[in-house]
Amino acid sequence: MHTRMQIRNRVNFGKITDLNLLPNLIYVQKKSFDWFLQSEVKDPTKRLNQGLEAVFRESFPIESPNNDMVMEYGHYVLGEPKRDPQECKDTDSSFAVPLKAVIRLIIKDTGEIREQVVYMGDLPVMTDHGTFIINGAERVVVSQLHRSPGIFFSYDQVRDTFSARVIPYRGSWLEFEMDNKGILVAKIDRKKNFPATLLVKAMGMGTNEEVLRLFYGSSKMKIAGANPKDLKRLIGRRTIADIINMETGEVMLDAGSKINEDNISILREMKVKEVDVIEFPKGKDNPVLINCLEKDGVNDYEDAVKKFHTIMRPGEPSTIENAEAELKRLFFSPKTFDLGIVGRYKINSKFEFNNPKEFSKADDRVLRKQDIIETVRYLVMLMSEAENYYPDDIDHLGNRRIRSVGELIANQLKLGFSRVERVIKERMTVQEPEQQTPQLLISIKPITAVINEFFGSSQLSQFMDQTNPLAELTHKRRLNALGPGGLSRDRAGFEVRDVHYSHYGRMCPIETPEGPNIGLILSMSSFARVNDYGFIETPYRLVKNGKVQKQVEYLTADKEEYHYMAQSNSTVDEKGEFTSKLISTRHRGDFPFRSPAEIQYMDLAPLQVVSVSTALIPFLEHDDANRALMGSNMQRQAVPLLTEEAPFVGTGMEARAAYDAGVCIVAKKDGVVSKVDATGVWIKEDQSKEIVHYPLIKFKKTNQGTCFNQKPNVSMLHTTTGGKVSKVSKERVEVTTPNGEKETHELLLSDEVQFHAVVKEGQEVGIGAPVAGQIIKGEKYGDFGQILQKGTVLANGPSTDAGYLALGRNVLVAFMPWEGYNFEDAILISERIIKDDVFSSIHIEEFEIQARETKLGQEQITRDIPNLSDKAFRDLDESGVIRVGAEVKPGDILVGMVTPKGETDLTPEYKLLHSIFGEKAKEVRDSSLRMPNGFEGTVIDIKRYSRETGDELAAGVEEMVKVYVARKRKLLVGDKMAGRHGNKGVVARVMAQEDMPYMEDGSPVDIVLNPLGVPSRMNLGQIFETQLGFAAKKLGINFETPVFDGASEGDVNDFCKKAGLPENSKFQLYDGRTGEKFINQVFCGYIYMLKLAHLVDDKIHARSTGPYSLVTQQPLGGKAQFGGQRLGEMEVWALEAYGASHTLQELLTIKSDDMLGRARIYEAIVKGIHSIKPGIPESFNVLVQELRGLALDIIIKDSEGLEVDISDYEDEFSKNKKKIKFETIENV
């Protein structure tokens, strides 16, 4: 029997976790781009007003300035991409589709309509994996986390004041806050200040009485016939309306005035029967608005609007028309002010206006008068400490939303289209109407410019992290609070970065970078999804009357506020009823106990709190959060290895992570394998009976230089001897060999791996002929990207093993100190690991050369290069390109190329000789592509592109060659390794296998870790993993222990017993060098270790002669610049402390930047002269020149008083300047 599969049974300890409910992990990206493009809508006229369609509709129609013509938009059409994604990567082009739009130009005088399909530029489109390919590089547009538009109320603890802020999606900000004088001030764009009541009056509430009645209740109090007690209660109250003397028309008491004893007697004299007084909330006198009314100084609508206009536009004439237009422009015009659908939704839910039908109306996305009035009312109530009025928590996820790919691109296009609109209007006025067509009027340059700028250089369009499948997946699920319109790293405080209770199930509390971006770059939790408004939702099971339902509901953070949530591990009986009378629940930031009747929802799974990366850490519940953070981040840096191996102890998330990352090839439809080889898999589909070919990607370079290679994961059963098929059933196929022996092939190997016979009884089969093909299932998805049926994984990608994520290898570990070689997290490894390529990986580098057309002639790719030995050409073909399979070292030629040299004026005789004999060496120089320093390997692929063969190349490029060099990297001393629990270290020594500590059965351990790395780090998960890993190895099964729902200590001990291992996993080890027993028993087991992308080969660097900085003449810094070491000021202090003057002088002059001195010392070494006179360092000359820039001249004199020339030139300035001479420091 021939099969490529090693089938291991799996034991899952999870009692609650159901991974089938997980949404597709890159659904965020795909859904957002589908929303933007609406490519699924068959009829383009039926597209919804969103994304790209909304951009067109907002920009059109465009009227000419003199109103004689108008340009209208019909619909847009998307073409087909010119190349497939892989071709785009190879040719450094973008994966994009041509965008065309049907545009009509209507001439108003004649009614003539000119319609054209106008090309609007190329629009990059998303690949199936949620990425974009821009100029050959795969990029990801990261979702941005920003403050949601809407109205926010905040409390300033320092000033003890409340404020309100209206934040639109686009337009002017409106703020209300208290000033120092106790007046409620409105601010527009943080510049113009005026009393808040002025704005309220300008919206139609003209008089003080109208304003007061709008915000306060009132009650009538008797004066006539009232007893003294009642009259006393009237003192201190405020009138809500003006009290006017009916006979004279005089205002006796203004609205809002306090009533005192004198007022009462005047009112009694006037025979006023009763007065209307203000009813303040909670009965507290709060004169905020009354102070405002006194300050605003107007008492009717017209005056209010005019005063508002004068404040906003001082110097302009304030007519009622101008003033109303200005107010409309600021807050009530869809052109200049847009709350967005989200802003309107937030305002409606804040003030409980329920009018969802009006959401889509454009007018509804501007402010309404009611919104401003309600904002002021809410603020007044907050100041009055009224019940059920609270300030907003700015860090709550109900107030922060996600801007995904589609929205980010749409915002960029809006900018481009606004520039196009300006160009169109200019062209409409310049050209004659008869000659104009849509094509001539529209300039697409602004559109292509914003698209290229966004994808090429925006902070949110990032070069995809492709180190391994997990890095790829996490990058697409990342949330970034930085970027345009977001926070800035320097100004973000502690509160924004901190974990908030509303993050539960929405954003991972663990996965975030260490360093300045901590808490600003986050990851979505595993079950989270983004709703239509951009708010993150998380799923819960519904609880009705204390019974848990099967129904699942997704809630946003602000909807969750009002409910009590039970934990997913609360005990429930078969009927779905809670077994306890009091249940631990979550409510806002608190954890109260509640009866089952009070609970409305229950968590779906313990896993929903954390992100995919964190969900891959087994026994996470036993790890400290800081170490779990490191573990999550380091898994993304694991290099794909030569031989992948799934972990013995996983979490059950490995299969889904590998599946959704898109590195594996998955069957689209049900069928049976009909052929498998290294280049592809062929499936005969059940329905169509067609044979479908799935090609494999072989040895491609990723963005990070790791190797992307796919290997078949399905197989066929073949006969070894051939013969006649004697029996075919569902269970097995029997073949009778020519000798009469029977060869049996079992078809049902496991639940997952089953075969279907491809031969019939009585059929003759040859040696090695296939008798059965593996049964394949096609994938099926639900509406929200959740998997209904997983497709069979036909081929494994990098870091995957049988469809499971496999980032590292299981190795036998002993936790013990060993001769100090594992001091401070260092790691001791066995030579077997290197010999058997356990941690070897393949890395691929791409080298590129372009032959251009220069002023002096064309560069040529050729083998004919002057002044080189034959040895240099040994691996080049006849056209000068290296052969595939050649071993290359630093300095070797990969592609030979010559460039024409500039010729000096030659004598006529020389030219004549030159034309007769044609000396090639004189006219060209060698500009070949050579292997750079520090690189070596094997050439695995060559790609050639030329204009002659019709390839599209950049301007001026005639030919381009790419050479791919692969290199096998074994584990070396200095390489960084890590486990999944933040237990990282550097390989300190590779030891002979026979010298490693060995167990009683003679098997040496693979790796020795320091036990002191565990207690202080508090990551005990690695101890449980090691112990259970040993049991898994012995029993031949793989364990899955989901986070917060995994194996208990008892479970681990039970499986250790079954495997015949001690419960504490401690063993007697022997010293490999002496054979003696170690005094104490040692904790051993199998741990999953990763090799990280911090390889010592990429970091080690030595410089002989290299580049110098032009100004200071000191070596450059860093490996990339081939730099050298710098003797900095601290090193100088160290030498000064020892008084090592000669050493210091030597280091600061001839060994550094004394240009003449360093040339002389070379000569002295060659001639064997031991004394050398130092000169002046170049950095001193820099200092002198800087002082000269301050019009100071420095002259240096030697011991005999003679001037030392420090400058190579004397300019006019230095001859005529005033000389400042000094010999001693005092003179200065």
Curated annotation (Swiss-Prot):
The keyword Nucleotidyltransferase applies. Its EC number is 2.7.7.6. This is DNA-directed RNA polymerase subunit beta. GO terms for molecular function: DNA binding; DNA-directed RNA polymerase activity; ribonucleoside binding. It comes from the Bacteria. Pfam families: RNA_pol_Rpb2_1 (PF04563), RNA_pol_Rpb2_2 (PF04561), RNA_pol_Rpb2_3 (PF04565), RNA_pol_Rpb2_45 (PF10385), RNA_pol_Rpb2_6 (PF00562), RNA_pol_Rpb2_7 (PF04560). CDD domains: RNA_pol_B_RPB2. One of its GO terms (biological process) is DNA-templated transcription. Belongs to the RNA polymerase beta chain family. The RNAP catalytic core consists of 2 alpha, 1 beta, 1 beta' and 1 omega subunit. When a sigma factor is associated with the core the holoenzyme is formed, which can initiate transcription. It catalyses: RNA(n) + a ribonucleoside 5'-triphosphate = RNA(n+1) + diphosphate. Keywords: DNA-directed RNA polymerase, Nucleotidyltransferase, Transcription, Transferase. GO terms for cellular component: DNA-directed RNA polymerase complex. DNA-dependent RNA polymerase catalyzes the transcription of DNA into RNA using the four ribonucleoside triphosphates as substrates. It is an enzyme of class 2 (transferase). The keyword Transferase applies. NCBIfam families: rpoB. PANTHER family: DNA-DIRECTED RNA POLYMERASE I SUBUNIT 2.
